[in-house]
């Protein structure tokens, strides 16, 4: 029997939780972060479930573990953990991780105000604004994002046939826009969106294939992005992003905002240099920007950036005790 101890720094990014594991993370094998992610999932996924699920976490919990970089052009490597698994990339998680890592002295950037992250999805460039000991704002330049498919149709409970576009922004997103059987996210409750989303995701994954053309391990649709008209006077659009089994992102979602910008750019509604301010279900904002045009395996793409803020909420030393029947966590359906 053993008691495993993890020192965590807890916080949130624009309302969505981030738990940064600053001590106790396992040593991982692999020459890339994608390989280290695979090792973690094969042997240490109990750490993720123990720290993210109840009774130590909750349905919306999201986190990260810091590692030495696997590539010379990066300052630090990040493994993202949450209730839905180990995401290749997480935008809100990046903003929270960078904020807390800088404020707590866990990372020393080679160049003050800039940081290169080694993630399973690739290099993510960071610029941050610091006022004394506090990080006020983080802008991440994400991996290339692209529109993957248009007009895919499946049956949605209660609503009927629904058409979605699928875009990649670090994860694959099904984007649900207003149409005959769906009006606006504001016309439905969060509980309805949570009930419909896993069915929609499952049916899309069963009917269609989703495969990143350059990253073989990214091969499924993981998120549903419900769209709506903005309420905030600065915002261009509003969203509710579903992830995991029953979670709605409280932030505007960084990789989701990247995917949305890629979709809009592919349809001629955004161009390099344009800004896109995205509002979350609770009214917080991410400031997106199309940095430049790009290409992914011959597909037109964009390089998006996302800016947002995070706040630290406290320190947490968490035990995963083998004597505990719920050591590896649980989720109530």
Curated annotation (Swiss-Prot):
| UniProt: substrate binding residues | 91-92, 223, 249, 254-255
Q: Is Endoplasmic reticulum there in the keyword field?
A: no
Kindly state which keywords UniProt assigns to this record, in alphabetical order.
Isomerase
Which GO molecular function terms does the record list?
Answer: 4-hydroxyproline epimerase activity
* Record's subunit section: Homodimer.
NCBIfam families xref list: PRK13971.1
PANTHER family, from UniProt? Answer: TRANS-3-HYDROXY-L-PROLINE DEHYDRATASE
Q: What is this protein called?
A: 4-hydroxyproline 2-epimerase
Q: Which organism is it from?
A: Brucella suis biovar 1 (strain 1330)
Source lineage = Bacteria, Pseudomonadati, Pseudomonadota, Alphaproteobacteria, Hyphomicrobiales
